[in-house]
Amino acid sequence: MKIGIVGAMAQEVEILAGLMTDKTEHKIGSAVVFEGEVNGKSVVLLQSGIGKVAAAIGTTVLLQGFKPDVVINTGSAGGVAQGLKVGDIVISTETAYHDADVTAFGYAKGQLPACPATFKSDEKLTALAEKIAQKQGRRVKQGLICSGDSFIAGGERLAQIKADFPPVTAVEMEAAAIAHVCHAFGVPFVVVRAISDAGDGEAGMSFEEFLPIAAKQSCEMVLGMLAELE
């Protein structure tokens, strides 16, 4: 099995890249792809860049050029569900765009034409992520992860997302685009991210401070999953 791993920023992929052996680096457009082995498993690791378009470009490059069997999106997210704290793990059951609106034509909020209302994560990958989180003794929550091209720092924007998507667990800027591309190509995916901030008025300061912690936590989750993927 070849495992695709996607992170937006250097901080979100550098630990895994550092563990990779027989590593080859490819720069394709805005995407950086590291190809090699991690703990004996065949891995292609994408640093996509930030935002939905960069994530979609990179994921398309990954799927077309390197043909992974599954995709895991790793990195950080802003916690929205009550009780989530920095370092907690969120696992996607589904993803949606919080900034897409074609409701004038009868679509659900966040739904684009010719697409489902949400992109469902692979149930086996979701269950594996939950198993690893429990095995590692982590606080974890499964649910809807919403994506958009804005860093959410509380206020009206966060309130609107909660109103539009009551089950929302966490927010970030790439997952739904990655899921969209995986859906289009028929590749199973899951999002496994660690909370770096609470998506509130202190989010910017919290994100800068806690990103390294979130990156380490999500990386440890991915390594646990790699050990059991066959």
From Swiss-Prot:
One of its GO terms (molecular function) is adenosylhomocysteine nucleosidase activity. Its EC number is 3.2.2.9. It catalyses: S-adenosyl-L-homocysteine + H2O = S-(5-deoxy-D-ribos-5-yl)-L-homocysteine + adenine; S-methyl-5'-thioadenosine + H2O = 5-(methylsulfanyl)-D-ribose + adenine; 5'-deoxyadenosine + H2O = 5-deoxy-D-ribose + adenine. GO terms for cellular component: cytosol. The active site is at E12, D197. Pathway: Amino-acid biosynthesis; L-methionine biosynthesis via salvage pathway; S-methyl-5-thio-alpha-D-ribose 1-phosphate from S-methyl-5'-thioadenosine (hydrolase route): step 1/2. InterPro entries: MTA_SAH_Nsdase (IPR010049), Nucleoside_phosphorylase_d (IPR000845), Nucleoside_phosphorylase_sf (IPR035994). It is an enzyme of class 3 (hydrolase). Substrate binds at G78, I152, M173, E174. Keywords: Amino-acid biosynthesis, Hydrolase, Methionine biosynthesis. GO terms for biological process: L-methionine salvage from methylthioadenosine; L-methionine salvage from S-adenosylmethionine; nucleoside catabolic process. HAMAP family: Salvage_MtnN. NCBIfam families: MTA_SAH-Nsdase, PRK05584.1. Catalyzes the irreversible cleavage of the glycosidic bond in both 5'-methylthioadenosine (MTA) and S-adenosylhomocysteine (SAH/AdoHcy) to adenine and the corresponding thioribose, 5'-methylthioribose and S-ribosylhomocysteine, respectively. Also cleaves 5'-deoxyadenosine, a toxic by-product of radical S-adenosylmethionine (SAM) enzymes, into 5-deoxyribose and adenine. Belongs to the PNP/UDP phosphorylase family. MtnN subfamily. This is 5'-methylthioadenosine/S-adenosylhomocysteine nucleosidase. It comes from Actinobacillus succinogenes (strain ATCC 55618 / DSM 22257 / CCUG 43843 / 130Z). The gene is mtnN.
